[in-house]
Regions:
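An N-terminally biased module of ancient metal coordination in phosphate/nucleic-acid-related enzymes
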Residues: 1-95
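Hydrophobic faces of well-ordered beta-strands that scaffold small-molecule active sites
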Residues: 19-23, 54-56, 96-98, 104-106, ...
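Non-catalytic positions within long, well-ordered alpha-helices that form the structural scaffold/packing
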Residues: 47, 155, 212-213
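Short acidic/histidine-rich active-site segments
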Residues: 59, 217-232
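Extended substrate/RNA-proximal surfaces in nucleic-acid metabolism proteins
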Residues: 66-185
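Mid-to-C-terminal alpha-helical segments outside catalytic/metal-binding sites
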Residues: 92-94, 234-259
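Histidine/acidic-residue-rich catalytic or RNA/ligand-binding cores of hydrolases
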Residues: 173-180, 200-209, 227-240
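His/Asp/Glu-enriched short active-site or ligand-binding loop at hydrolase and phosphoryl-transfer sites
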Residues: 186-198
Length: 259
């Protein structure tokens, strides 16, 4: 279906990460993949740039994507079976599990109260302990009151928090005091690889590099959605600045590999 992928140059630049911990390839549950075939083609492209494993992270965002954890788990189970039945001779990354990307919004607390949050588990080499990690995001349009309190409350409930793509929020700058305070609270940051290649524009690109330079970034994610994103990721794999960054920095993605 998308055979033009094969014509484009690619490098296994992201092999050191082992695992992509942020992608939207469960079909028809959010703004990500629209079909099994699209997911298969995108997964094949992700394998080509070095990923051995991927973690699906569907949106939980009120009112746009009112997903239910039980339904998502059932869809994921069926999707895994469909992938195995239709992969043919494709080389694909292994799917390790499924995690939610939860927006801090009016529906967030209901997911917390349900006791069914879909989280990561990994061993933090800095602290020598296994942690449960909750992936959260903020609105891309405007800052919401109480965002820091919502994150602090989760830590008090025993969760550690990963903030998705802080570089994409227009209300934070390269030296945001708010983000610095979150780091002091122990919040992990995940930057989008495509931000580093300018996919979302120059402002997000600059902040992505600045946050890494600040020592704030713990994870890199593809935030993969569709074929267009896959083409952009292939382009990013040949970006010399990104290749150098991958050689210079060590991220925690691989610590999710055994889960």
């Amino acid at each position: 279906m998308f055979g033009f992928f094969k014509k484009n140059k690619t490098l296994p630049t992201f092999a050191p990460l082992v695992t992509d911990m942020h992608c939207h390839l469960l079909p028809l549950v959010d703004d990500g993949s629209k079909s099994l075939e699209e997911s298969l083609e995108v997964m094949e492209a992700m394998h080509e740039v070095g990923y051995e494993q991927i973690r699906l992270t569907p949106h939980f965002s009120y009112p746009r994507y009112q997903n239910d954890e039980d339904n998502i788990l059932e869809r994921y189970k069926n999707f895994c079976s469909e992938v195995e039945a239709n992969r043919g001779d494709r080389k694909l990354p292994r799917m390790t599990s499924i995690t939610g990307e939860y927006q801090i919004d009016d529906g967030f607390q209901a997911h917390v109260d349900s006791g069914k949050l879909l989280t990561y588990h990994f061993s933090d080499p800095k602290q020598g302990a296994e942690k449960g990690l909750l992936l959260v995001e903020f609105s891309l349009r405007q800052k919401r009151m109480g965002m820091d309190e919502a994150i602090f409350a989760r830590t008090m409930e025993g969760y550690d928090v990963i903030l998705a793509h802080p570089e994409r929020y227009p209300y934070f700058n390269s030296h945001s005091q708010f983000l610095e305070q979150l780091k002091e609270q122990g919040v992990y940051f995940q930057v989008n690889i495509l931000s580093l290649d300018g996919f979302y524009g120059p402002e997000s690109q600059k902040k992505a590099f600045d946050y890494i330079e600040n020592g704030w970034v713990d994870f890199l994610g593809s935030d993969m959605h569709n074929v267009g994103y896959a083409m952009a990721l292939r382009h990013a794999s040949t970006n010399k600045k990104i290749i150098k960054l991958m050689e210079k920095n060590e991220f925690l993605n691989a610590k999710l590999a055994i889960n």
